[in-house]
Amino acid sequence: MYKNLEEHNRLVNKYLKIFFVVSLYWCTSILTVFVNKHLLSSDTVNLGAPLFMSWFQCVVSTVICFVASRLSRKYPSVFTFPEGNPLDIDTFRKILPLSVLYTLMIGANNLSLSYVTVAFYYIGRSLTTVFSVVLTYVILRQRTSFKCLLCCGAIVVGFWLGVDQESLTEVFSWRGTIFGVLSSLALAMFSIQTKKSLGYVNQEVWLLSYYNNLYSTLLFLPLIIINGELESIITYPHLWASWFWAAMTLSGLCGFAIGFVTALEIKVTSALTHNISGTAKACAQTVIATQYYHDVRSALWWTSNVVVLVASAAYTRVKQLEMMRQHQQRSTATQKA
């Protein structure tokens, strides 16, 4: 009886931890999207350099981690930061694939956000679950059940319905939609690669975030030039305004927070759970955006949101039941042994 009670308490604590981390991810992610959209498209800021903004977010994150690392060495009893050397060649070689995916993910993400509304922004991200299933099979050789595949099919239907309805509006952008899909693909790959990369840094999320952002600051520089953003930055009328850099710093802080919380959510749950959490969060974000920006959408447009949400929830439930069944089978086998 005591063993069952102890197991129950352990399970409750685990669920509470997961709930807290997922809630933190939701709040941080939604705030980041609205801040970035304000910087990219608002009448007051309208920077028009999404990759430069992504680069600056990585710079802020790198500085925070560097300062934390130095404080930890000087005041170890007050500050704690894992030991590591980002300039180590072996470390660079191991973490670089994750940094490439991270650069692609946040770069495509901000490019998409610069073209589409916040309300439609989630549509491209809704395919993350589908990409995750495909990549899990291609990379990890793990098969997915027929029920899960049906749910993925429904998600694709919801995605195309949303694109079809959005294309009827004046604010629709194919370029923004394509960048959104590309960001979803990068996120699915990033989630899988994160689990592997955490093993290289002894499961230290802070250290992985430090390496990842530092390497990404280097990767973004040629992309900024290729995207033709140098002229936009140099000729930007508010470049030396204090309020502009304050807004950029806030965006950088949000970027650091979302990077850390994303890695933390993957660590305490799984890559799949993180992808599903991101999709569900995006649906809530859509409702908030339509209210905040006073967007009026058609019934079919809202139907696409519902289809994606229900299909994602069904996928989550199916995966949960499959995991519970596997756990029971392992427990039964252990008891027999």
Curated annotation (Swiss-Prot):
Pfam families per the UniProt record, alphabetical: TPT
Membrane topology field: Multi-pass membrane protein
GO process terms (BP): GDP-fucose import into Golgi lumen; GDP-fucose transmembrane transport
TM segment ranges: 13-35, 45-67, 95-117, 121-140, 145-163, 173-192, 205-227, 242-264
Compartment list: Golgi apparatus membrane
Highest taxon above the source species: Eukaryota
Alphabetical list of InterPro entries matching this protein: Sugar_P_trans_dom, TPT_transporter
One Gene Ontology cellular component: Golgi-associated vesicle
Swiss-Prot/TrEMBL keywords: Golgi apparatus, Membrane, Sugar transport, Transmembrane, Transmembrane helix, Transport
Cited function: Involved in GDP-fucose import from the cytoplasm into the Golgi lumen. Plays a major role in the fucosylation of N-glycans. Functions redundantly with Efr in the O-fucosylation of Notch, positively regulating Notch signaling.
Similarity section: Belongs to the TPT transporter family. SLC35C subfamily.
PANTHER family attached to this UniProt entry: SOLUTE CARRIER FAMILY 35
Protein name (database record): GDP-fucose transporter, Golgi
Species the sequence originates in: Drosophila melanogaster
